[in-house]
Structure formats: structure tokens, C-alpha cells
Curated annotation (Swiss-Prot):
One cellular-component annotation, GO: nucleus
Biased composition (Polar residues): 292-304
UniProt cross-references to SUPFAM superfamilies, sorted A to Z: beta-beta-alpha zinc fingers, Retrovirus capsid dimerization domain-like
Keywords: DNA-binding, Metal-binding, Nucleus, Repeat, Transcription, Transcription regulation, Zinc, Zinc-finger
Residue span, SCAN box domain: 30-112
Protein name as catalogued: Zinc finger protein 449
Gene of this entry: ZNF449
A Pfam short name: SCAN
UniProt xrefs under CDD domains: FYVE_like_SF, SCAN
């Protein structure tokens, strides 16, 4: 039933949507919101703001009511609890509301004539253990699935609500191929089953021992049947015994899988992570892939008396850095870190400022640069209330209040908070001016001073006011100019409480107070 459901849904997708699709921008914004990573932001403040922006783009609180936003959230959760095939089919049709989702699922059930409980749990377990493909069924085994009841009457299973292999009937007649085709035909080609079984080997000893073994019953009663909901009883002695007696189960394709080890690994995974059933299905499929031998290998071609020992899953150690740069040999823990590092060698700067066109290697660098245009200063000094664009600038400024000066000039004894400040100061003693202008030959001790000087030749004014359009060569000039529009006057006189936009204006004003004292 599960195979028929998956194939029918795929056939419906291939034929195209019969419903009118709506704008997919909402789904795009939802995926961006769910897939956003903390490492994409420069810090917690930026990460929170980015998540807020993505959430508003998805839910659109200014356009939607509270009830509509709540419906979107419930709709998203409802899609995640659907079976994987139905969820994929519904998302392809991009439903815009709950009525649309319910009608899509009801139409699909009526089209495929599927009951509301969808799929038998036994079939779902077999579907996860054996992907759709050319199946080879051992001659002495049959299933209690309705799609395969043409093979003969099924014997009553010794364990309730669990499927185990059963010995086949004495005689099987597969001459009525037409009846079988009518029963299984869903309107698209199905893989052809190999029905030419030899009845001489139906009493092979391993089959009888397998169906009578307590280990097989315990495996099928355990939490590996996650949708049946039978609790697994932890018994160390039985687990050890299971590893010594026929540690396998046989799928529809004839592949032997390690039952006890598969059960043990899956229970550990389930106890570690509390995930929804659809996520457990995907994790179970991964465990099966790790233990699955070569596809198409039948029990007759494999040695079933020897335990199947798959290669253990290799876990990364905490300090392991497997990704190495071929240019410089530097190693990284993540491939994304290596990709970002390789841009240094290639000179690639993918992040461009829309205001001035300057490019950057990292998105965090671009975000900090854009503060120059917006005037944003998120870091504030708690002592003097002065604000800064970078946290490092705030830390350096706070040293002026604590009188922490760790860098001292040996020539004049002057101390500085930063090593870079001491380095610039030393050039005043040596007279070093390494930065020279190619236009007029003038030299400067600092690169920033040369950059500002060159703008007098090029007449470049990169700092533009967003209010009036006036441009400036230096950013401090733009900051002072913006105070005209904002009305900010940060410099306050301590005598008369009068405020000024520039420090020079405050100094000139304070002279009037001192004149009276003289």
C-alpha cells in the first residue's frame, strides 16, 4: 500500500498540478527564516534583527491579521506531521489556507481510494527497510500485505501487530496473471516480481528458525516500529544473545539487515533526540543504508550464518579539522570556513555596498561598513554616553576612563591605550613618512591622511547626506552636518546648560564665561 501510494503521488506530480498555484514568495521567506544560521550574522544583535526581518517578510504582520498569522503557523506544523509522500505532494500545490490543504488531501484519498488511516503500519515498516525497486522474494516467505495476497493464504502471525516471515503453502499457482495484473495495476508500470520459486527448498532450516526465534519477535515489537508505539524493554542479556543468533532480517529485495544492531543503534538515536515520526523515518533509513549490503544480493548468495558487521560510523573528534586549503595548507573544521578562506587567495569579494560600491570579503564586514552610511552607532559608553560603530572602539575608549594605558613611549614617556597609537606616535620622533602622494609628492605618516589628501586631487566626495544630497570628503564632516537635520547637540555647557552641535562652538562659548572671571 505504501509503495502504491508513493508511486501514485509521483505519477500525479509528473502530470502537473491540477490546481491553480499561488505566489511562492511566502514559502521562500519561510525557508529563509527556518534555515537562517547564527554564523551568518556578525553578532547576537545582528542575528536577532535579521531573524525579525525574515519573520516579518514571511508572516507580514502589517498586512495579515492575528488569526491569519496563527493559521500560517498551524499550517506549517500540519504539513510537517503528514507522511513524507503526501507532504511533498501538497507542497507542490502551494496551498494558501487550511481549507485548501484539507481539500487537497481529501481529493488525493478519493482519487487513490485510500482510507484515512493511510497505510498499514507493517507496510510502512517494510517500505522504510526496502526502497522501491526490483524485488526478489525468497521462495519460502510471503507477506500479509493485501497487495501480495495472491501468493496464497496468509497464516496467522504468532505475534500480534507485527510482521514476520512465514512458511509458504504447499502449492502455489501463479497462472492467473491477468487477475494479479488487475489487482495491482494502478495505471503506471510496476516492477515485475520474480514468481518462479522452487518449492523444493521451502523447508530450509534458517527460515523456520528465523520465524520461531524470540529475537525476531523482540526486534519487531521494539521501537524500530515507531508508528506502532510498542515500548522496547531494555534487556542486556537478550541483546547479547541476539548478536549471536541470526542477527538479520530479510527485506522485499532479499537483503539481509542486522536486526539487533539496527535496533540498538536506532533506540540510542531515539533516546538522544526527541524528533517527530517523519524525522525518525528518515533517521531509520540512514541506519538501514549504513548496514545494507550490496543491493540485489539474495540470502542464497550470502553467508547468513556469519554476522554481518558493517563499518562503524566514523565520528569527528572535537579538534579535528579535515578540510585543508591546497594553497597555504591551513585546516578548518567546516567546509564553509574553507570556502570563505579560499576567497582570500582568489581575491573574490562577493559582498558589495549598494551606497558606494565598495566590496567586502564577508557579509559581516559589509554590515559594519553600512553603518558609515546610516550613522548607526550601537555601542554606547556607560560613563560619557559616547557611541561607537564597533565594539573594539568602545573597549579602547573605555580605557580612557579607567586610565589604563599599557603602551608607553620610551623616548618621551607618553602612554597610550592601543599599540597602534604608540606606533603612530613613534613616527613623530623618527620623522618617518612612508606614504607619499604620486600627484604632488607630499608625504604622510599615516595612510588615512594620504587617502584624505588624494581626494583633493580627484575631488572625490564619497560621504553623501541622505537628507539634502550634499557630499563630503571626510566622514566626520558628514556626521557634523547630519546634526543640522536631526537637531542633535551633544556638547553641553556645564555653566548654563546651553548645547552645541560642534565642540569648537562649545569652546568659544565657554570663553564668555571665563571673561567675566578675568
Amino acid at each position: 500500500m505504501a509503495v502504491a501510494l508513493g508511486c501514485a503521488i509521483q505519477a500525479s506530480l509528473n502530470q502537473g498540478s491540477v490546481f491553480q498555484e499561488y505566489d511562492t514568495d511566502c514559502e521562500v521567506f519561510r525557508q529563509r527564516f527556518r534555515q537562517f544560521q547564527y554564523r551568518e550574522a556578525a553578532g547576537p544583535h545582528e542575528a536577532f534583527n535579521k531573524l525579525w526581518e525574515l519573520c516579518c517578510q514571511w508572516l507580514k504582520p502589517k498586512m495579515r491579521s492575528k488569526e491569519q498569522i496563527l493559521e500560517l503557523l498551524v499550517l506549517e506544523q500540519f504539513l510537517t506531521i503528514l507522511p513524507t509522500e503526501i507532504e511533498t505532494w501538497v507542497r507542490e500545490h502551494c496551498p494558501e489556507n487550511r481549507e485548501r490543504v484539507v481539500s487537497l488531501i481529501e481529493d488525493l484519498q478519493r482519487e487513490l481510494d485510500i482510507p484515512e488511516q493511510q497505510v498499514d503500519m507493517h507496510d510502512m515498516l517494510l517500505e522504510e527497510l526496502a526502497p522501491v525497486g526490483t524485488a526478489h522474494i525468497p521462495p519460502t516467505m510471503h507477506l500479509e500485505s493485501p497487495a501480495l495476497q495472491v501468493m496464497g493464504p496468509a497464516q496467522e502471525a504468532p505475534v500480534a501487530e507485527a510482521w514476520i516471515p512465514q512458511a509458504g503453502p504447499p502449492e502455489l499457482n501463479y497462472s492467473a496473471t491477468g487477475e494479479c495484473q488487475n489487482f495491482l495495476d494502478p495505471g503506471y508500470p510496476l516492477p515485475k516480481l520474480d514468481m518462479n520459486f522452487s518449492l523444493e527448498n521451502r523447508e530450509e532450516p534458517w527460515v523456520k528458525e528465523l520465524q520461531d526465534s524470540k529475537e525476531m519477535k523482540q526486534l519487531l515489537d521494539s521501537k524500530i516500529g515507531f508508528e506502532i508505539g510498542i515500548e522496547n524493554e531494555e534487556d542486556t542479556s537478550k541483546q547479547k544473545k541476539m548478536e549471536t543468533m541470526y542477527p538479520f532480517i530479510v527485506t522485499l529485495e532479499g537483503n539481509a539487515l542486522q536486526g539487533p544492531i539496527l535496533q540498538k543503534d536506532y533506540v540510542q538515536l531515539e533516546n538522544q533526540w526527541e524528533t517527530p515520526p517523519e524525522d525518525l523515518q528518515r533517521d531509520l533509513a540512514k541506519l538501514v543504508d549504513q548496514q545494507n549490503p550490496t543491493l540485489g544480493e539474495t540470502p542464497e548468495n550470502s553467508n547468513l550464518e556469519e554476522p554481518l558487521n558493517p563499518k562503524p560510523h566514523k565520528k569527528k573528534s572535537p579538534g579535528e579539522k579535515p578540510h585543508r586549503c591546497p594553497q597555504c595548507g591551513k585546516c578548518f573544521a567546516r567546509k564553509s570556513q574553507l570556502t570563505g578562506h579560499q576567497r582570500i587567495h582568489s581575491g573574490e569579494e562577493p559582498h558589495k555596498c549598494p551606497e558606494c560600491g565598495k566590496r567586502f570579503l564577508r557579509s559581516s564586514d559589509l554590515y559594519r561598513h553600512q553603518r558609515l552610511h546610516t550613522g548607526e552607532r550601537p555601542y554606547e559608553c556607560t560613563v560619557c554616553k559616547k557611541r561607537f560603530t564597533r565594539r573594539s572602539h568602545l573597549i579602547g575608549h573605555q580605557r580612557t576612563h579607567s586610565e589604563e594605558e599599557t603602551y608607553k613611549c620610551l623616548e618621551c614617556g607618553k602612554s597610550f591605550c592601543h599599540g597602534s597609537s604608540l606606533k603612530r606616535h613613534l613616527k613623530t620622533h623618527t620623522g618617518e613618512k612612508p606614504h607619499r602622494c604620486h600627484n604632488c609628492g607630499k608625504s604622510f605618516s599615516r595612510l588615512t591622511a594620504l587617502t584624505l589628501h588624494q581626494r583633493t586631487h580627484t575631488e572625490e566626495r564619497p560621504f553623501k547626506c541622505n537628507y539634502c544630497g550634499k557630499s563630503f570628503r571626510q566622514r566626520p564632516s558628514l556626521v557634523i552636518h547630519l546634526r543640522i537635520h536631526t537637531g542633535e547637540k551633544p556638547y553641553k555647557c556645564t555653566h548654563c546648560s546651553k548645547s552645541f552641535r560642534q565642540r569648537a562652538g562649545l569652546i568659544m562659548h565657554q570663553v564668555t564665561h571665563f571673561r567675566g572671571l578675568i
